[in-house]
Amino acid sequence: MLELKGVTKRFLGITAVDDVTFTARPGEITGYLGPNGSGKSTTMKMITGLIEPSAGEIRFDGEPIQRDLIGYKQRMGYVPEEPHLYAHLSGLEYLIMVGQLRNLPAKPTADRIDGLLRLFALHGDRHSPISAYSKGMRQKVLLSAALLHNPDLILLDEPFSGLDVATGLVLRSLIQELAARGKVVLFSSHDLEIVERVCSHVVILHRARIVADDSIEHLRTLMALPTLEEIFSQLAVEQDTVGISRQIADLIQA
């Protein structure tokens, strides 16, 4: 179980995340939503251990993650929003490197890498440099690297970015399958339709603070709104989206 308790992050006096508290449980897919600048990415970086909170605590299975950060990271798989990869390596070389850095046993890891490359339709390009890969192919490499060590906690930051329709459907089903097998899955995305299809529980962030933390079904009932998009718009969108779209259309036609 992943627990955030009163987590706050300040940069030079500016509060990026303010008193965030929520729980992501095994077997459950938790959606973490918010507009740009709301603090989602900062929260994800704190959960991965890349940065430390200014206040509050993050626990996994009851233990503060900073107590044994290396051990915690061995149990975590992370797909970041931006695919920063070693472009001079091939997809196969990159995954071998990830396995070695994690001290995974060579033979079973090689078999697992081969299987992941085949199932993600990368096997034919496994010897090509990542610099020649499309964005979707790079995303598949990141997904493979995040799952290579069979992590207990899976953090996904815009994981569908760049994926073709078929791979997107596979990933959607895979996320559900991993949760069903007892993984803790935290899923951050701007694609509310996918979140609504995949997640049972959502946390919505606005102006660095949580404005909703509930099941999607209960939020629908509570707010008397039929879709997650409408719920999100009411809680976290301050702009007149229709009015702005009309102004843009008027401007380009003037």
Task: List each language-model region with its residue ranges.
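Conserved ABC transporter NBD signature motif
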Residues: 56-67, 71-72
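Conserved ABC ATPase "signature" region
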Residues: 96, 100, 107-125
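Catalytic Walker B motif of ABC-type/P-loop ATPase nucleotide-binding domains
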Residues: 154-157
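Helical segment within the ABC ATPase nucleotide-binding domain
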Residues: 169-181
